[in-house]
């Protein structure tokens, strides 16, 4: 087989493989009961429907909104000081055009892969929230648990097309700050970006 034929065939094979993964992933809906929500054991097969997964994401978005509001009640300028927030460059996972999650150029398989990878990358930032958030800590614990559950659901849909990134412990140390305002600014920035990330992922979840 010559190289020109191989190079033309490879993208088709990859796309076909992704489509086969997606086709086999969605037709197995099952109940999402209390046992499911309380059990995030790695490797456990989680059966759910796109509607219930969407509801899970919306609950997380509402939780994040409540956490941001809780912080802002203690600081009137927390959401308006964009310059201060911009200085705290945390290299947070974000959706880009190439990730297939935007309305223009939407690709369900690619979007699901990017969503799963991004949520795995967010784990270190959730560790920071767990350590530094001074509001209702139960909200942080619930958010972490729900994101782990969502990651498990999405991993089942994309099979073995993604690997867990290495934990960046150095980043967690670099994020530490004794300045209360800087700390809160980082928390707000993490929550805001995570909320946007989850909202973009909804388009892929809604597709059946």
From Swiss-Prot:
InterPro entries hit by this protein: 4_helix_cytokine-like_core, IL-6-like, IL-6/GCSF/MGF, IL6/GCSF/MGF_CS
Protein name from the UniProt record: Interleukin-6
SUPFAM superfamilies assigned: 4-helical cytokines
Keywords recorded for this protein, A-Z: Acute phase, Cytokine, Disulfide bond, Glycoprotein, Growth factor, Phosphoprotein, Secreted, Signal
Classification lineage: Eukaryota, Metazoa, Chordata, Craniata, Vertebrata
Signal peptide: 1-29
MF terms in GO: cytokine activity; growth factor activity; interleukin-6 receptor binding
Family affiliation: Belongs to the IL-6 superfamily.
Its biological purpose: Cytokine with a wide variety of biological functions in immunity, tissue regeneration, and metabolism. Binds to IL6R, then the complex associates to the signaling subunit IL6ST/gp130 to trigger the intracellular IL6-signaling pathway. The interaction with the membrane-bound IL6R and IL6ST stimulates 'classic signaling', whereas the binding of IL6 and soluble IL6R to IL6ST stimulates 'trans-signaling'. Alternatively, 'cluster signaling' occurs when membrane-bound IL6:IL6R complexes on transmitter cells activate IL6ST receptors on neighboring receiver cells. IL6 is a potent inducer of the acute phase response. Rapid production of IL6 contributes to host defense during infection and tissue injury, but excessive IL6 synthesis is involved in disease pathology. In the innate immune response, is synthesized by myeloid cells, such as macrophages and dendritic cells, upon recognition of pathogens through toll-like receptors (TLRs) at the site of infection or tissue injury. In the adaptive immune response, is required for the differentiation of B cells into immunoglobulin-secreting cells.
SMART domains: IL6
